[in-house]
């Protein structure tokens, strides 16, 4: 056998191997699409997903696109939740793999991006729902969900700016921790101290990102003041003199700490009765009668104008 015959034989064998792989590794996209169109999502997934995973080199953008939509519907139908909800995470990956193919049709490209936006916002909505029904210890999961949302948004738009939403999230979490303090469930425990520290941390973090937010400043001041009042209300006939002095010192520190954010909120909106009342009350708690009376008079003048 001469050299050229050997080359032809090798080439023929390569073609046979390629044809065999094309036949046995065929991806049933059309059949999966028909199943999906008839609402048989699980069957469509069980047919398409293994074929795509086992033949990733053969899978084109369209195959990943179809798989992504099947996984998205399964996620919705299953009512999944949590950072690691499998169908949601798989759907995100499939759509991103579809978009990585330049051959993906323009309509499918646009639909993939819309689907990714929907999936990213589902992470965001879940994070906000967890803040609204906040329980102690949920913070890590909330931030993990937000990171998933931000990562997908940044994938869709490299110029995506998370600052405003992060500032809002810190403010919401600060208020959530403040609400936990109000329940008195953790009264006089180390956990209560941790909750107060977390509330302060999130108020400060929010103001770092949005220094001019009136609501953040006002609520920060109220949280500190109210916690001082709670300490005073716990004084009873069993409180020792030493404990009484400790409580008084802690309360004064909280009242003093609440003054700057309340003053800043008032400077921002000097016509708001709530900040005037807040300043009047804080100064009164600090035994600063002259300052308290001055804010009381400002309140009276403001009320007369209304």
What is each of the regions a protein language model found here?
Residues 42, 49, 89, 96, ...:
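Alpha-solenoid helical repeat scaffolds
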Residues 70-140, 178-201, 226-260:
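Short coil/linker segments at helix-helix boundaries
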Residues 52-62, 77, 97-116, 150-169, ...:
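Flexible helix-coil transition and linker loops at the boundaries of alpha-helical arrays
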Residues 1-37:
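Bacterial Sec-dependent N-terminal signal peptides
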Residues 236-260, 264-306:
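Terminal, low-structured helical/coil segments at or just beyond the last alpha-helical repeat
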Residues 26-89, 119:
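Start-of-domain marker
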């Amino acid at each position: 056998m001469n050299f050229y015959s050997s080359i032809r034989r090798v080439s023929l064998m390569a073609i046979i191997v390629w044809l065999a792989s094309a036949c046995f590794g065929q991806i049933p996209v059309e059949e999966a699409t028909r199943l999906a169109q008839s609402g048989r999502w699980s069957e469509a997934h069980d047919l398409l997903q293994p074929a795509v995973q086992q033949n990733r080199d053969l899978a084109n953008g369209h195959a990943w696109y179809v798989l992504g939509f099947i996984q998205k519907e399964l996620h919705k139908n299953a009512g999944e939740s949590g950072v690691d909800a499998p169908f949601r995470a798989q759907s995100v990956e499939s759509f991103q793999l579809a978009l990585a193919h330049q051959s993906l049709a323009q309509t499918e490209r646009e639909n993939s991006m819309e689907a990714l936006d929907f999936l990213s916002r589902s992470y965001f909505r879940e994070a906000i729902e967890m803040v609204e029904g906040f329980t102690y210890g949920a913070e890590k999961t909330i931030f993990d969900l937000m990171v998933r949302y931000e990562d997908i948004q940044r994938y869709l738009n490299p110029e995506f700016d998370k600052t405003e939403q992060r500032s809002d999230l810190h403010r919401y979490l600060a208020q959530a921790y403040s609400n936990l303090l109000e329940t008195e469930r953790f009264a006089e425990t180390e956990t209560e101290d941790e909750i107060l520290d977390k509330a302060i941390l999130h108020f400060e973090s929010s103001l770092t990102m949005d220094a001019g937010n009136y609501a953040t400043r006002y609520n920060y001041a109220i949280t500190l003041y109210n916690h001082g009042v709670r300490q005073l209300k716990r004084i009873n006939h069993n409180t020792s003199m030493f404990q009484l002095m400790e409580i008084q010192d802690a309360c004064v520190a909280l009242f003093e700490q609440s003054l700057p954010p309340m003053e800043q909120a008032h400077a921002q909106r000097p016509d708001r009765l709530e900040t005037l009342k807040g300043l009047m009350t804080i100064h009164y708690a600090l035994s600063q009668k002259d300052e308290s009376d001055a804010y009381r008079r400002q309140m009276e003048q403001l009320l007369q104008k209304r």
